[in-house]
């Protein structure tokens, strides 16, 4: 890249091409948990036709400090240019790459009850690159049914399905009594990550398998605490 062209790229709010995203360094989970929020706000800015934004303007929208934004993004090399700010489209795409959204991830759901079917009905997952390919259950009355054209299969079919389909993520929406054994089975079948909605903290033998536990009642308890706190002011 010539120096003149590099300056032109920078003038548009892009980084020089030598600035590559490096994920080898350890990034705190607190930073990782904030990245989807940046991605969401940047998507809204694109919908509004905003082409560039300063860290101060972004901080006002997100109700966080500008220094927090700069520190978070600097973990990945930084994306802004002094006097210009951030190119919204570029930053949106780069955060998408950081979060792995430039690759399709196939998901299966274990448990086709109310929660499992609600997840299968959430179409926005597909827009983010997450495609639910099947649900599994032990209830024979659900066999052969579909949720948004996604088939419900019997749990006994899980082994064969995973061996013939390239599944990345399994969502567990089943009773906690069976969750541990099913989780280990999924790991043995090559699942890379488990999205755990069962009311149990899972442990599996393979430490490279990512487990993200979602306890829905935890959020309600936090709301309850804040209601009590506010009532005491």
Which residues does each PLM region occupy?
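NAD(P)-binding Rossmann-fold cofactor-contacting core
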Residues: 128-148
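Extreme N-terminal segment that seeds HTH/winged-HTH DNA-binding domains in transcriptional regulators
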Residues: 3-51
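Hydrophobic/small residue at the entry helix of a nucleotide-binding pocket
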Residues: 115
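Phosphate-bearing ligand-interacting subdomains
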Residues: 43-47, 150-233
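HTH-adjacent hinge/linker in prokaryotic transcriptional regulators
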Residues: 52, 56, 61-104
């Amino acid at each position: 890249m010539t120096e003149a062209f590099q300056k032109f790229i920078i003038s548009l709010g892009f980084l020089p091409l030598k600035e590559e995203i490096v994920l080898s360094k350890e990034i705190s989970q607190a930073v990782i948990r904030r990245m989807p929020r940046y991605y969401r706000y940047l998507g809204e800015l694109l919908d509004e036709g905003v082409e560039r934004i300063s860290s101060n303007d972004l901080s006002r929208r997100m109700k966080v400090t500008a220094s927090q934004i700069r520190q978070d993004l600097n973990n990945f090399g930084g994306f802004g240019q002094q006097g210009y700010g951030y190119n919204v489209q570029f930053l949106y795409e780069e955060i998408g790459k950081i979060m792995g959204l430039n690759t399709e991830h196939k998901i299966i759901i274990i448990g086709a009850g109310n929660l499992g079917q609600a997840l299968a009905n959430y179409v926005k997952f597909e827009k983010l690159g997450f495609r639910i390919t099947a649900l599994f259950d032990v209830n024979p009355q659900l066999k052969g049914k579909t949720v948004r054209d996604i088939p419900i299969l019997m749990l006994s079919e899980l082994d064969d399905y995973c061996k013939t389909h390239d599944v990345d993520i399994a969502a567990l929406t089943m009773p906690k009594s069976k969750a541990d054994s099913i989780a280990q089975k999924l790991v043995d079948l090559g699942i890379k990550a488990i999205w755990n909605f069962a009311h149990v903290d899972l442990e599996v033998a393979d430490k490279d398998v990512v487990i993200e536990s979602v306890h829905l009642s935890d959020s309600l308890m936090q709301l309850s605490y804040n209601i009590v706190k506010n009532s005491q002011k």
